Amino acid sequence: KTYDVENYPLRALVCEALGHEDLENLHKHYTYEPFTMENNSNTELHDRFYDKLRSGWSAFHDTYDLFVKEVIVPIYGSRDFIYQTLPTFRVHLVGNWAVPEFHCDSQPGYNHPEGEINIQIAVTDMFGTNATWSESVPGLGDFAPIEMNQGEFTVWDGGKLNHGNMIND
C-alpha cells in the first residue's frame, strides 16, 4: 500500500531527528559491532530519534496521528482500535541487523498483546537483506523479505508470524 509522502513527510521528519538527509548512507557515518538483543536499539541514532520524539515534537506527533487517522483507520472502517503512541524505530545499517533474532511479537519476552497488528512504514527502500523477513503463514518457515519502497507501508501479523532480519549487505 502507498501513502502520500507530501501529506505525511515521515522520511523528512526522521531525517530532521537524525540530522542526516541521506538515510541510505548512515552506515558511512556510524559503525557498530553486530547488535545483540540487549543493545539493538542502543545507538546514537535511536537516542536522537527517541529524544526528539519524547520532547513533544509536534511536527512528528501530528503527522503520525494524521497518518493513522487518514490512512490506517479507513482500512479498518469504524472499528475501534488503539495504537502505539511512540512508534518503534528500527535502523538497519549495512553490516548489521535491526533485530538479531527471529521471533513472534506475542512470544514471551516481547509481550505484545494478542490481536495486535503491525504496520511497517518504509522511509527508505526495503529490499533483500535490508528488509524485514517474515513467514507467510504461522509456522510455515517460508521466510521472504517484506519489500517496499519509500512511501509504502504494509499491514501484517507480527504477533503470529515469525520474522526478523538478515545481516544487511
Give a label for each model feature.
Residues 52-60, 107, 111, 146:
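Conserved aromatic-histidine-acidic binding/catalytic patches
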Residues 1-75:
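N-terminal auxiliary "cap/dimerization" subdomain that precedes the catalytic jelly-roll/cupin core
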Residues 42-55, 83-84, 116, 130-132, ...:
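Glycine-rich, often proline-containing surface loops adjacent to acidic residues and nearby aromatics
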Residues 69-127:
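Conserved double-stranded beta-helix
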